[in-house]
A protein has these predicted regions:
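Iron-sulfur cluster-binding electron-transfer modules in prokaryotic oxidoreductases
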Residues: 1-182
Length: 183
C-alpha cells in the first residue's frame, strides 16, 4: 500500500488528539503507511485567508513543499486542513504568478513548490485505496445492530473530485452501521 505524508494539523495535535490517535491506529490496521510531515505548520484554517490570501496560500504551500521533498502525497484527517491544503495545491498549480510569489517566499526555508503531489482526506484513502472489502477483512468486532448517525462536516466534500454528488455523498456510507436518522 502507498505511503503518505500525514498532516495532523493544529486541532488534531492539541484538542482532537483522540481523532489523531484513532486515525493513525486505523491506518496501521488497514495497512496505510503514514509518515508525519516533517516540520509542518498551521494551514491557516481560520478566517485568515480573507485577510491575506497570498500569505495563507504560502502557509499551506510550505507544508506541500515539505511533502514534495519527502516524495509523498499528503493526507489530512482534519476537514479544514484538507480543504485548505487541497484548494491551495490546486490554485498554486494552476496560477504561474501565484506559484512564483510563493516559491520566492519558500526560498527562505530552502523549499520549493513544484505541484507534484496530491492532497487527500483520510476517509478518501480508506474508501478508495483500501476499499470496502479491505476494510471488511480487518473488522474484529462487527457493529451488528448498532445504528450510527455520523457527522462529517461540509468541508470534506467541498473539493470532491469526480462524479460524487456533493449534496448526497455516498462514499461515507460504505459501512453497514450508518443510518439516516433525524438528529
Amino acid at each position: 500500500m502507498k505511503k503518505y505524508a500525514y498532516f495532523p494539523g493544529c486541532s488534531l495535535e492539541k484538542v482532537a488528539w483522540s481523532y489523531n490517535d484513532s486515525s493513525i491506529e486505523t491506518a496501521k490496521i488497514l495497512g496505510v503507511e503514514l509518515q508525519e510531515l516533517a516540520d509542518w505548520n498551521c494551514c491557516g484554517a481560520t478566517a485568515y485567508s480573507h485577510v491575506d490570501q497570498l500569505l495563507a496560500y504560502t502557509l499551506v504551500a510550505r507544508n506541500l513543499a515539505q511533502a514534495e521533498k519527502e516524495g509523498l502525497d499528503m493526507v489530512a484527517p482534519c476537514s479544514a486542513c484538507y480543504k485548505n491544503s487541497y484548494f491551495a495545491n490546486k490554485y498554486i498549480k494552476e496560477d504561474a504568478d501565484l506559484s512564483e510569489h510563493i516559491n520566492y517566499a519558500l526560498e527562505e526555508d530552502d523549499l520549493q513548490f513544484n505541484g507534484s503531489i496530491d492532497v487527500h482526506h483520510i476517509i478518501d484513502i480508506y474508501a478508495n485505496e483500501v476499499g470496502v472489502e479491505g476494510i471488511k477483512a480487518k473488522v474484529k468486532k462487527p457493529l451488528e445492530g448498532l445504528k450510527v448517525a455520523a457527522y462529517y462536516g461540509c468541508q470534506i466534500v467541498r473539493p470532491r473530485k469526480g462524479a460524487e454528488d456533493l449534496e448526497d455523498p455516498q462514499f461515507f456510507e460504505i459501512g453497514r452501521a450508518s443510518c439516516r436518522e433525524r438528529v
